[in-house]
Each structure stands twice: as structure tokens, then as C-alpha cells.
Amino acid sequence: MTYHEMYRSTTLGTTLREALDEMLAHNLLQPGMDHKVMQKFDQCISNALAKRVKNRLSLRGHLNTYRNCDNVWTLVMNDVEIKDSSAIMTVDKVSLNSPLICKI
């Protein structure tokens, strides 16, 4: 199974990348090992979010654009109302990215 690299741009992903770069610069990590660590990060973060996150949100707004590239859906919505169990928030624009997950 392939995992998407979208979580590498999160705070956790960028911090990990910076730590790996520093370790490479000080010869504390073998060349190429950083790629293996990042691939494992992609796998672990995807699995953890799929299994452990149970919170739900409701979104209502106007769909501006949508696209599917490399099995990742991107939805851009305007004037969005976001609801969870305790609060309601309204924002001007939301961009959602989600990998397409198919189980056979």
C-alpha cells in the first residue's frame, strides 16, 4: 500500500524533516536513512489518524472547485459553516484534501 506525503507539511512532519537534516549534517544518520524514516512517518501518521481520531465535524458551504489528482481529492468551499458537538464556526474559505481509500 502506498501512503501520501501530505502530512509532511504539518508541524510534526516539518520538525521531523528538520531533525533528520540536522542529523545528516552531523553524520549521525546514514545517507538514505532519512527517506526510510519519512516513508515510515507517512505510514504511521496515516494509520494513527485513521484508527485513533474519532471526532466528527459537519461542514456546510458552497463548493467552489473540486479535483482528484493521484487519488487525492481536493475540495475548495466558500462561506463554510463548521459544526462539532460543542461549537459552530463560520469561515470564508476552506480547502480539504483527502486521499482516496479503497478496500477490496
UniProtKB/Swiss-Prot annotation:
Where would you say this protein principally sits, based on its record? nucleus
Mention any Pfam family matching this sequence. TFIIA_gamma_N
Keywords in UniProt for this one?
Nucleus, Transcription, Transcription regulation
Keyword Transcription regulation in record: yes
The keyword Transcription is annotated on this UniProt entry = yes
* Example of a GO cellular component annotation carried by this entry: transcription factor TFIIA complex
Which GO biological process annotations does it have?
Answer: transcription initiation at RNA polymerase II promoter
Task: Enumerate the subcellular locations listed in this protein's record, separating them with semicolons.
Answer: Nucleus
The family line of this record is: Belongs to the TFIIA subunit 2 family.
* Function (record text): TFIIA is a component of the transcription machinery of RNA polymerase II and plays an important role in transcriptional activation. TFIIA in a complex with TBP mediates transcriptional activity.
Subunit details: TFIIA is a heterodimer of the large unprocessed subunit 1 and a small subunit gamma.
Give the protein's recorded name.
Transcription initiation factor IIA subunit 2
Species for this entry: Schistosoma mansoni
